Regions:
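Oxyanion-binding "anion nests"
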Residues: 213-264
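Short, glycine/acidic-enriched capping/hinge loops at junctions between secondary-structure elements
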Residues: 46-50, 298, 323-324
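Intrinsically disordered terminal and processing segments
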Residues: 309-348
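Short polybasic amphipathic segments
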Residues: 169-172, 243-246, 253-255, 310, ...
């Protein structure tokens, strides 16, 4: 199937329960049409094909009508292939779309965004992007992050969300040197815990984070030491040496460390293409990982969900309630954070 060996398919079949669990517990499927959008992987990763195979086998097991479409790997500012856009637009309302992609879907035709389109049409969706960063050997680890107790995960996420929704400020500290404060007065947190059963809902898989935008453009001050993984134009990668970001008036003004040049090159690339380049370096998000089944592997779809990590994002946040609209969004992950909500230490 899809060019995978019999041995690989056999291993995927052994994990069928994991994929069935997603259809049942997260998407709450009945008899909807399922569209899976994928690509053929990269030189180091066949994970998009492996995930696609798992979802296809589980859909067939449930008797769901399933269609799979492939496109080339999309990077930077590339558009989704025309036949992909057409396949999405042919779907009946209130269908299910699953993305299993090496990097990203690509810009979605003339629509505002894939997420907005799904909301308008009542489609439920799962998004597993950036899989090209994940070696085949990590397939089992990836599935373990999906095979969690979703009731417990949702309970944990809701507790954090309720606390953050009431907060005026959140400070994060780490022994590595992070000490940053977010003004979040009046902002609403998002709990991404796999509750994708309602019309127009969807999100990441694996899931398991709570995140919040800062108030306005200038509501972040301090220093963040990135010591787990980072997102740059080439994709996500593990951090070999800590990367220190200095933030003033909500904006990254200084970067220090081995990987500073790489992040700087990424930000400059997007500034050169952005309609409003001054927005690209703004800090857009504070997040906390709450998934006990996830581990840091150098793939942002997983790393930002790991229990015992925190993250910030640089760039856009307009789609989740923030004031920054731009063409870049890059998460940066750090280990062992301590969160203080209005001065009081928070338990995760």
């Amino acid at each position: 199937m899809f060019g995978l060996s019999k041995e690989v398919i056999s291993e995927i079949e052994k994990k069928a329960a994991h994929f069935n669990k997603i259809y049942k517990n997260c998407l709450k499927v009945k008899n909807e049409d399922v569209l899976i959008i994928s690509d053929y992987g990269t030189s180091i990763s066949q994970l998009p094909l492996m995930m696609t195979t798992g979802y296809v086998l589980a859909a067939k097991d449930k008797g769901l009508p399933v269609n799979v479409v492939f496109q080339g790997v999309k990077k930077g500012f590339m558009q989704a292939d025309d036949h992909i856009t057409e396949a999405i637009k042919r779907l009946e309302k209130k269908s299910i779309i699953i993305l299993a992609l090496s990097n990203k879907l690509g810009r979605f035709g003339e629509e505002k965004s894939f997420r907005t389109y799904c909301q308008d049409k009542g489609h439920r969706f799962l998004s597993s992007t950036g899989l090209g960063d994940v070696k085949n050997d990590y397939f089992d680890l990836f599935l373990e992050a999906m095979n969690v107790n979703y009731r417990r995960l949702q309970k944990r996420g809701l507790a954090v969300k309720r606390l953050w929704d009431k907060a005026s400020s959140i400070t994060v500290k780490t022994d590595a040197g992070t000490d940053v404060t977010f003004d979040v007065e009046g902002m609403q947190a998002i709990s991404n815990t796999g509750e994708y059963g309602e019309e127009g809902c969807g999100g990441n898989m694996p899931c398991g984070e709570v995140y919040i935008p800062p108030k306005g453009l200038t509501g972040v001050e301090g220093q963040v030491v990135i010591d787990a993984s980072m997102k740059v134009d080439q994709g996500a990668q593990l951090v070999e040496e800590p990367l220190t970001l200095t933030i003033q008036d909500g904006k990254v003004v200084k970067m220090e460390g081995k990987h500073a040049k790489l992040l700087e090159a990424t930000l400059r690339k997007y500034e050169d293409r952005a309609e409003y380049p001054l927005r690209v370096r703004h800090v857009a998000e504070l997040g906390v990982g709450i998934n006990p089944g996830a581990v840091v592997i150098g793939s942002m779809i997983m790393d930002e969900k790991v229990l015992g990590t925190g993250h910030i994002a640089i760039g856009s946040n307009s789609w989740f309630g923030g004031a920054i609209k731009t063409i870049f969004h890059g998460d940066q992950v750090f280990k062992s954070p301590k969160y203080y909500v209005d001065g009081k230490k928070m338990s995760v």
